[in-house]
C-alpha cells in the first residue's frame, strides 16, 4: 500500500494505519486512547505547555527530546531520569550539568494533575512532550501510544553507560542493539541533532589534539573548524555552547544529514555516521538517503521514536503525583 501523508500545520502527520505498517509493534498494554475517558484533554494540555516553554526558550525543544532519549535508554521509558536523590540519574556523567528541562516537565505535570489528578504517568507526559517538541519545531507528528508506568528506582550506573559523543560507531550501535533498536534507528534518532546546542566540553577534543599528535579531526570542515576554535579556545570555558546545525538551528529538518556530507557534523558521534570506515557498510548510505529525502528521514525518525518509546524493562510501576519522587 502507498504511504499516505497529510500536511498539517507545516509538518507531516503520518496516518496511524501507515505507521502500523511501517513500525514494529507497540507494546500490548499501550494505546493512544488509554486516557480518552479518564483525561480527555491530555494531549491538548501537554501541547499547550510545551508551546509556552518553547516560546520562552526555543532551545528547550531539543532538551526535552534529549530527556526522553536518556530516560528510555535506562530502565526503559519509565521517567526514572526525573527522580531526585543521591542515586539520581541526573547525577550521572552524561546528564549532570547537561540534561535540562526538568522544570518544564514539572509544569506540564502540574497542569495535567490539575485536570486529571493521579491518572497520567510522568513517563507518558515526557513521551508526549518529546513528540510535541518535534512537531512544534517543524518536524513530523505521530500518535503516541500511552499507558506507561513510572519506575520506582533510578539507575545511575546504567545512566553512566548511555551512548557517548566520544565513542566509536561500533560501540554506539551495540548500545542501540542492546535495547532492541537497529542501525536505521541509530541514524534516524541521531537526526534529532538537527536542532539544539552542545557544550564545548563534548566536541572540543576534535579541535586541537584529536590524534594525540597536535592535529584536529581531519573530518571536520576547515571553515567550521576555524570558527569552533574561536568559540572554544584551548583552556576556554567548556560550558559555552555551539549549535548542532548552524544552517537551521531551531528547525527540525534533514539539514543535519546534509551537514555530515560536508564534514560539518559538530560531534564526533555525528560525523562518524558518514566519515568513519565502519560507516561504509552500516550508516553512510542512510545518511546520504536522508540528506536527499526529508520525507524518508521523517518516516524513519517517527518509527524510531515509536520503537524507542516502547522500550521497557518489564518492572512494575506507578503513576507518580510528583515526577521527582516516588509516591508514599
From Swiss-Prot:
Residues that bind heme b: 193
Record field: catalytic activity: 2 a phenolic donor + H2O2 = 2 a phenolic radical donor + 2 H2O
Example of a GO MF term: heme binding
Residues with the Pyrrolidone carboxylic acid modification: 29
Record keywords: Calcium, Disulfide bond, Glycoprotein, Heme, Hydrogen peroxide, Iron, Metal-binding, Oxidoreductase, Peroxidase, Pyrrolidone carboxylic acid, Secreted, Signal
UniProt keyword annotation of Disulfide bond present: yes
Top-level taxon in the UniProt lineage: Eukaryota
Residues at which Ca(2+) 2 binds: 194, 245, 248, 251, 253
A GO-annotated cellular component: extracellular region
Site keyed Transition state stabilizer: positions: 66
Membrane-spanning intervals of the chain: none
Enzyme Commission designation: 1.11.1.7
Cofactors named for this entry: heme b; Ca(2+)
InterPro entries, alphabetized: Haem_peroxidase, Haem_peroxidase_sf, Peroxidase_pln, Peroxidases_AS, Peroxidases_heam-ligand_BS, Secretory_peroxidase
Tissue specificity as recorded in UniProt: Slightly expressed in roots.
Positions contributing to Ca(2+) 1 binding: 71, 74, 76, 78, 80
Sites carrying sugar chains: 182, 209, 239, 281, 310
Binding-site residues, substrate: 163
Signal peptide: 1-28
Disulfide bonds: 39-116, 72-77, 122-323, 200-232
Active site: 70
Note: There are 73 peroxidase genes in A.thaliana.
Assigned protein family: Belongs to the peroxidase family. Classical plant (class III) peroxidase subfamily.
This protein's name: Peroxidase 59
Organism phylogeny: Eukaryota, Viridiplantae, Streptophyta, Embryophyta, Tracheophyta
Gene: PER59
Amino acid at each position: 500500500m502507498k504511504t499516505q501523508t497529510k500536511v498539517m500545520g507545516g509538518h507531516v502527520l503520518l496516518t496511524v494505519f501507515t505507521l502500523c505498517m511501517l513500525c514494529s509493534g507497540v507494546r500490548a498494554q499501550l494505546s493512544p486512547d488509554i486516557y480518552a475517558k479518564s483525561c480527555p484533554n491530555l494531549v491538548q494540555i501537554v501541547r499547550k505547555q510545551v508551546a509556552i516553554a518553547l516560546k520562552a526558550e526555543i532551545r528547550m525543544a531539543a532538551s526535552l527530546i534529549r530527556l526522553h532519549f536518556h530516560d528510555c535508554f535506562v530502565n526503559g521509558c519509565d521517567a526514572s531520569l526525573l527522580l531526585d536523590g543521591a542515586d539520581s540519574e541526573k547525577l550521572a556523567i552524561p546528564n549532570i550539568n547537561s540534561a535540562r528541562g526538568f522544570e518544564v516537565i514539572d509544569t506540564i505535570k502540574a497542569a495535567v494533575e490539575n485536570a486529571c489528578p493521579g491518572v497520567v504517568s510522568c513517563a507518558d507526559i515526557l513521551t508526549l512532550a518529546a513528540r510535541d517538541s518535534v512537531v512544534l519545531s517543524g518536524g513530523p507528528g505521530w500518535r503516541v501510544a500511552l499507558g506507561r508506568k513510572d519506575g520506582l528506582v533510578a539507575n545511575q550506573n546504567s545512566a553512566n553507560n548511555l551512548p557517548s559523543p566520544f565513542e566509536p560507531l561500533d560501540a554506539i550501535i551495540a548500545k542501540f542493539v542492546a535495547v532492541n533498536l537497529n542501525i536505521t534507528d541509530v541514524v534516524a534518532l541521531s537526526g534529532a541533532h538537527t536542532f539544539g546546542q552542545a557544550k564545548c566540553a563534548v566536541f572540543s577534543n576534535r579541535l586541537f589534539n584529536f590524534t594525540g599528535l597536535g592535529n584536529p579531526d581531519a573530518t571536520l570542515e576547515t571553515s567550521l573548524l576555524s570558527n569552533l576554535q574561536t568559540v572554544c579556545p584551548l583552556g576556554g570555558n567548556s560550558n559555552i555552547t555551539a549549535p548542532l546545525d548552524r544552517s537551521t538551528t531551531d528547525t527540525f529538518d534533514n539539514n543535519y544529514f546534509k551537514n555530515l556530507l560536508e564534514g560539518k557534523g559538530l560531534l564526533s558521534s555525528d560525523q562518524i555516521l558518514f566519515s568513519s570506515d565502519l560507516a561504509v557498510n552500516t550508516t553512510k548510505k542512510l545518511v546520504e538517503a536522508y540528506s536527499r529525502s526529508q520525507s524518508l528521514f521523517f518516516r524513519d525518525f517517527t518509527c524510531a521514536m515509536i520503537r524507542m518509546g516502547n522500550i521497557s524493562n518489564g518492572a512494575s510501576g506507578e503513576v507518580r503525583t510528583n515526577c521527582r519522587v516516588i509516591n508514599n
